[in-house]
């Protein structure tokens, strides 16, 4: 049934769109954590220099600790509905992006992105001492690399979903056109059948009228 298949395509497209929204939420969380890491690196560079004293360095360390806590909070609270996206929970998601029930209509994605402070290795960083500040730089650089891998993974999924959505749009347009042609053909056939029936009905009426006229003409001749 073309109409039923088309309705399925519309819902599949909505599923693909929602899946894309989930990925965008994940990417948004990673982007904020990336900003935190960049700021941590700035503070590390600043604290590693003798341009500032111990007191100023302690103030910088307070900001560092707050930033680490915020990055960890973002990772643990970024959700799409009830699904946690950046805490490494590893839940496998299934996106049904086709009008049929077989596996070819499903995109599976395992949510293994873990951007928590402990996973990124930034949970114990400090800039209270110059040595700690210099160590922080290497730690943050490694964290940025790991974060980049996660963002690349989400980007690949987003690209696939975009392709899927475009393909669903094309299928929907083609099926809609086919359904319209079939419907027009059915209407044309019904119109032709109706016209044919009307012609037959008119012919039958004409024959009956002629049949009724014949006896009357005979009686007139006899009289």
Where is each model-derived feature located?
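Primary detection of the long, small/polar-rich alpha-helical "axial" segments characteristic
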Residues: 1-223
